[in-house]
Amino acid sequence: MARYVFITGGVVSSLGKGIAAAALGALLQARGYRVRLRKLDPYLNVDPGTMSPTQHGEVFVTDDGAETDLDLGHYERFTGRSATRTDNITTGRIYKNIIDKERRGDYLGATVQVIPHVTNEIKDFVTEGNQDYDFVICEIGGTVGDIEAMPFMEAIRQLGNDLPRGTAVYVHLTLMPYIPAAGELKTKPTQHSVKELQALGIHPDILLVRADREIPEAERRKLSLFCNVRPSAVIQALDVANIYDVPMAYHKEGLDDEVLAAFGIEPAPKPRLDQWEEVCNRIRTPEGEVTIAIVGKYTGLKDAYKSLIEALHHGGIANRVKVKLEWIESEVFEKEDPAPYLEKVHGILVPGGFGERGSEGKIHAARFARERKVPYFGICFGMQMAVIEAARNLADVPDASSTEFGPAKEPVVGLMTEWVKGNELQKRTAAGDLGGTMRLGAYKAALKKGTKISDIYGSTDISERHRHRYEVNIDYKDRLESCGLVFSGMSPDGVLPETIEYPDHPWFIGVQYHPELKSRPLDPHPLFASFIEAATEQSRLV
């Protein structure tokens, strides 16, 4: 039978509930337990697929094609377990499900209310499909007191009574701020947060307290007394240099021991943390440093590229080097020469994106990398812009463009209207809805034997995750290949270009998919490991 850990947050948002959940999952896994992580999001969007990346951050795509919260990326990276669409739900999705049921008559004429219908829908989501797991960790988005989160708080309160005794534990993540004028950490915000949680009928078993310095023992006892938790259950969560230190830091503070004790699991299996120790050691003691320029259009919010950032650092871990990131707004290159910005970097990465804004700047970045022999990694939109650059400057197609930007004389990149998923033909139109209509999730690709990318993967058959509506037009393939650009990977039916490269370039690869979504600190993605290796070689030349 599965045991449930509910993680709530208080005082302020962005305290790191997702990292805490992921780290706890990793620690329980290290003891041999089977762990599942799920995220409950209070916003009214059905999913984050149509939300602005500068507001919400990255949309994390699962193998089965769900557009989910970026915290699922943390879950995957820390545990190595691939998430599914059933690991994330929003208030919007819950209400949509309920309205669909009401229209079908599933409620037999009953008045549909928040209690019991909304709360039952949440409880069903939390408890379904967990028979193969020892622990289910549920992160509740938002902060205690948010009106949007109230149905979720009520649902997990009810679950404390519905589930068998001893199978539900509540962890509350709070902030203990330091007041310079007083010269001390303050417990009052945490006390009030816990009181608000208790007023909702939820009594936390464990307090995970964020702080920027050691919490004195006297303050821990104070929190224990006023928040009604055991002294050992007041766990300090100190700031760390990087997120991959968190599992080891929380283990040192006893979080996993306290969770297991709350379930009555004593003595617990000893954890095997040697892999995490090795990762932390490689991060702390790099043997070199490389600088990677990220030429993007959402650089104002780094969370828009969360998985990408982490995958680059994974590449650094694989090569024992520190990866320094230079963020460049692509629109800059539409007005200025890219050379002063890119001459000293060791690699250029152009990530995914949508829309015409900044596209010409990305094309200029691709040209600089091609001509100057700087390692270039184009992902999704970044591959498309590299192909347009090749068409304009190598294949004598000066009007090459994408239909995403409007009518194009030479549509080198165009809207996909049909593609095959499994054995089914998928179709969409330009006038259709935006939500959930892209080529989403894991698709197979066939790599050309003897190409750089097939050597990197060590295989000609791969599966990677996609999120795009536009694709390189296969009608231009022959003209582009005659100029030296190789289409090194295609969809299994040979219709959709998946990867490109220049054989005479030290490292110039474009991929239509998002390899960053499958990279892990304990298992870096081969493309990122190879890209950082090439950047390390470049660093010896610059």
UniProtKB/Swiss-Prot annotation:
It comes from Rhizobium etli (strain ATCC 51251 / DSM 11541 / JCM 21823 / NBRC 15573 / CFN 42). HAMAP family: PyrG. GO terms for cellular component: cytosol. Pathway: Pyrimidine metabolism; CTP biosynthesis via de novo pathway; CTP from UDP: step 2/2. This is CTP synthase. Its EC number is 6.3.4.2. CTPSs have evolved a hybrid strategy for distinguishing between UTP and CTP. The overlapping regions of the product feedback inhibitory and substrate sites recognize a common feature in both compounds, the triphosphate moiety. To differentiate isosteric substrate and product pyrimidine rings, an additional pocket far from the expected kinase/ligase catalytic site, specifically recognizes the cytosine and ribose portions of the product inhibitor. CTP binds at residues 13, 146-148, 186-191, 222. Keywords: ATP-binding, Glutamine amidotransferase, Ligase, Magnesium, Metal-binding, Nucleotide-binding, Pyrimidine biosynthesis. One of its GO terms (biological process) is 'de novo' CTP biosynthetic process. GO terms for molecular function: ATP binding; CTP synthase activity; glutaminase activity; identical protein binding; metal ion binding. Homotetramer. Allosterically activated by GTP, when glutamine is the substrate; GTP has no effect on the reaction when ammonia is the substrate. The allosteric effector GTP functions by stabilizing the protein conformation that binds the tetrahedral intermediate(s) formed during glutamine hydrolysis. Inhibited by the product CTP, via allosteric rather than competitive inhibition. InterPro entries: Class_I_gatase-like (IPR029062), CTP_synthase (IPR004468), CTP_synthase_N (IPR017456), GATASE (IPR017926), GATase1_CTP_Synthase (IPR033828), P-loop_NTPase (IPR027417). The active site is at residues 380, 514, 516. The gene is pyrG. Catalyzes the ATP-dependent amination of UTP to CTP with either L-glutamine or ammonia as the source of nitrogen. Regulates intracellular CTP levels through interactions with the four ribonucleotide triphosphates. The keyword DNA repair does not apply. ATP binds at residues 14-19, 71. UTP binds at residues 13, 186-191, 222. PANTHER family: CTP SYNTHASE, CTP SYNTHASE-RELATED. It catalyses: UTP + L-glutamine + ATP + H2O = CTP + L-glutamate + ADP + phosphate + 2 H(+); L-glutamine + H2O = L-glutamate + NH4(+); UTP + NH4(+) + ATP = CTP + ADP + phosphate + 2 H(+). Residues 291-541 form the Glutamine amidotransferase type-1 domain. Residues 1-265 are annotated as: Amidoligase domain. Mg(2+) binds at residues 71, 139. It holds the Pfam family GATase.
